[in-house]
Amino acid sequence: MTEEYGLDGIDIDWEYPTQKSAGISCSPEDTHNFTLLMRDLRKVLGKKKLLTCATIASGEYIDFGNCIKYIDLVNVMSYDMASPPKHHSPLYASDISGWMTTDAAVKKHLEKGVPHDKLVVGMPFYGRGLTPYKAYVPRPQVLTGVEEKWSAESQVPYMTDKNGNFVLGFENVKSVTAKCHYIIEHDLRGAMYWEYADDYEQGDLRTAVAQCLLPNEQQGTRGKKESQ
């Protein structure tokens, strides 16, 4: 199929080996089965096609020590890491974050044997909120009837009600740019986001990511952090 349709490769999003959380069947052997799957896919794809995988922020359920040699990119799903009233995709820890953050997710994967040049940081183009908000709030629906605030510690925006209570965590241009700067500073492979349709029609968030991470045509390097 990759040859027939001229595809770059295959991405595997198995949520998650040995776990039933996504309503799928599982086996205690699935961590090993995942390694075997990566091995067999690499044999079929050869060296010219990409083989990538999506992983939980904690880096659990996959034996990277044995399977990373088959994989080109590891797309870390560094979102949905906490439920409201905590932010689901903080860069760093704060009073609005849970125990897992984007920074912690990167460190977990490095500890488990994923090289920095194979690590891709995930960014959500949606928010997670409390009632009366839906659990999943596309970006264009975010800025209505509440006050926007910024966490300097976690480097993410959030919304509060009239009493100052956290009601919604989301991303904006400032926060995705902060994550892009983190990627550059830690020499990681790049970024991915979920999902394209959740951005504004004019593409505020995806444009910010592209401008920060894609090579500068004149300098031949990634975008540089602006002076503060």
Stretches with model-predicted labels:
Residues 1-3, 57-65, 171-184:
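Short, acidic/polar
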Residues 1-17:
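Substrate-binding cleft of extracellular glycoside hydrolase catalytic domains
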Residues 8, 72, 189:
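Receiver (REC) domain switch/active-site residues of two-component response regulators
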Residues 17-141:
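Substrate-binding surface in catalytic domains of secreted glycosidases
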Residues 25-33, 47-48, 200-225:
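Short acidic, glycine/proline-enriched helix-loop-strand junctions
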Residues 92-96, 163-171, 192-197:
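Active-site rim elements
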Residues 123-182, 208-228:
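Glycan-binding loop/region signatures in secreted carbohydrate-active enzymes
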